[in-house]
Amino acid sequence: MNKTLCGVAVLAILASGNALAHKEGDFIVRGGLAAVVPNDSSDDILGSSDELEVKSDTQLGLTLGYMITDNISFEVLAATPFSHDIKTDLGGLGTIADTKHLPPTFMLQYYFGQAESKLRPYVGAGINYTFFFDEGFNGTGKGAGLSDLDLDDSWGLAANAGVDYMLNDDWFVNASVWYIDIETEASYKAGTTKYKTDVDIDPWVFMIGGGYKF
């Protein structure tokens, strides 16, 4: 009798595990707080040894994925617009400008483990397109004679890793990280002279939140 009960319990657990799985044909939606932390560098500006520096920002991050097989998925990363202060040590100016950007990123991912696993770590690689908007110099920048800021959009490679842990048949918690190659050219004027500066933003993106599969 005890052996029978144990067998039934094991089968119940296995059935529950299968129900909890990410599996072929599932759509996966994730949401959470996403922090963009630039690993930035730039050419020298205005003939000095100083660089432009892009500050971090945190917004709502969203992803939508589709399980092509039990182990392979396609995912799109989106977010509400990120807003970044741009600063420089040139002349002790500090923050001189700001910009907003959206970073849609398209990933192909591999999930480790079996379809019935509640814990699914994954890695991925793909491509990012970042477009900048509402860029401009603030009062400090304008006071220093700077104007007409324009940032070129960027195409670059991306890599990520993450892990999902199923709470029940549909809901799970998630933690993930991306490294994104973002390079832009900043065009601007100092007085009447035009300048261009290459800026490598190359951010780490950290997201923690939850998700739903259907």
Residue positions per predicted region:
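N-terminal targeting signals for Sec/Tat export/insertion, comprising classic cleavable signal peptides
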Residues: 30-56, 60
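A charged, solvent-exposed segment within the mature domains of Sec-exported extracytoplasmic proteins
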Residues: 122-174
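Short, conserved structural micro-motifs that define repeat-unit consensus positions
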Residues: 63-67, 172-174
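Outer-membrane beta-barrel translocator domains and adjoining extracellular loop/strand segments
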Residues: 41-48, 85-93, 133-145, 185-194
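Predominantly the C-terminal beta-signal and adjacent terminal strand-loop region
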Residues: 83-87, 98, 168-214
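Cleavable N-terminal export/targeting peptides
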Residues: 1-25
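Gram-negative (and chloroplast) outer-membrane scaffold detector with strong preference
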Residues: 22-26, 35, 39, 65-139, ...
